[in-house]
A protein has these predicted regions:
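Bacterial N-terminal signal peptides that target proteins for export
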Residues: 1-12
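N-terminal leader/targeting pre-sequences
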Residues: 3, 18, 22-186
Length: 186
């Protein structure tokens, strides 16, 4: 009986380790954020995890205040960034975290301090960097990340009354964790 109990605990521990560990070939991506004049205003590093995609958002020179941040459906960033299409929404859900099942590209607002600089990490469990999956940001026309002038109200369809698009970055592949020493993007 003691052997079975020990075997069960070892099996459970192995299963948990497999579920929560990051594979060595984790997919990485990056988006260089630029404003409408083409000036760099930040970067978004994306890393595939077992729980979804971890986005590390670093901005500098963005107007202080609350700004909507979304993954958009098209990998184009021609000013004024309407070329990025609507929010990434492969499942055709309504917009907003307050609507139940939100767009896959719906994200929490960014709260930019008076310095205009922010570094924050956000997990999006609704998207993937794995090509061929229905919720992959690497579909036929790619994807972009967009910062809006105003906050997302988390409910108004289709875009949360977030206002104009003030910064945009095309999501591009940047290898795997194995190519950067097995570490998350910096």
């Amino acid at each position: 009986m003691r052997i079975l109990k020990s075997l069960g605990m070892v099996s459970a521990a192995a299963l948990l380790a497999a579920v929560f560990s990051l594979p060595a070939s984790a997919e990485l991506a990056n988006a260089a954020l630029k404003d409408k004049s083409g000036k760099p205003v930040g970067d978004v590093d994306l890393m595939q995890t077992p729980a979804g995609v971890l986005l590390k958002i670093s901005v500098k020179g963005v107007e202080p205040g609350e700004h909507a941040f979304h993954v958009h459906a098209v990998g184009k960033c021609d000013a004024p960034f309407e070329s990025a299409g609507g929010h990434f929404n492969p499942d055709n859900h309504k917009h907003g975290m307050m609507s139940g099942a939100a767009h896959a590209g719906d994200m929490p607002n960014l709260h930019i301090p008076q310095s205009g600089e922010l570094v924050v990490e956000i997990l999006n469990p609704a998207i993937t960097l794995v090509k061929g999956k229905p919720n992959s940001v690497f579909d036929a026309d790619g994807s972009a990340v967009v910062i809006h002038a105003k906050a997302d109200d988390y409910k108004s369809d289709p875009a949360g009354n977030a206002g104009e698009r003030i910064a945009c970055g095309i999501v591009s592949e940047s290898g795997s964790a194995a190519t950067v020493g097995g570490q998350a993007p910096k």
